[in-house]
């Protein structure tokens, strides 16, 4: 018989170990400090609604179904400035979770050239317009007085400015059903970036 190679912790040891918890679910900005190019940026975030909805063609109209009503509660959100990131992977090495921030976090392009050369990412084209690409497919979000208008190859969605719930959706072509998660993500990101430097500079090229 042999003693266990790894023994269980005593109650006191377990309590001591729990004190080492970084509380990553509340705030974790490790990747912003270990990036040699300062490409990862932490943005202060107020609690925001995050509805999960899907648009379904219903006869001559479109029906919006709400699957859940979530909320974005973390005080800080991380974005990656693609222009400055050389994808060295340092942030992935130090990330206390299994993530790779330079790949997982929204990639923000400050220049038109950087945005045009990337298959994915976002660019604040003007103080009221966010452009994006996912898998090479373009979409845009325009901020209006009472909300947002999101346009992609699949749909045009009008979102309420307070709840981010869809108030009107038009499905394009032969599209019979489309998730609205991309629209909500774009609106959430716009709220984080708008009026914040270096994303909302006085000139947008």
Which residues does each PLM region occupy?
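Generic structural hydrophobic/aromatic packing signal, biased to beta-strands
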Residues: 1-2, 21-24, 35, 95, ...
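Basic, glycine-/proline-tolerant helical and adjacent loop/strand elements
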Residues: 41-86, 90-144
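Histidine (H) residue identity feature
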Residues: 50, 109, 158, 202-204
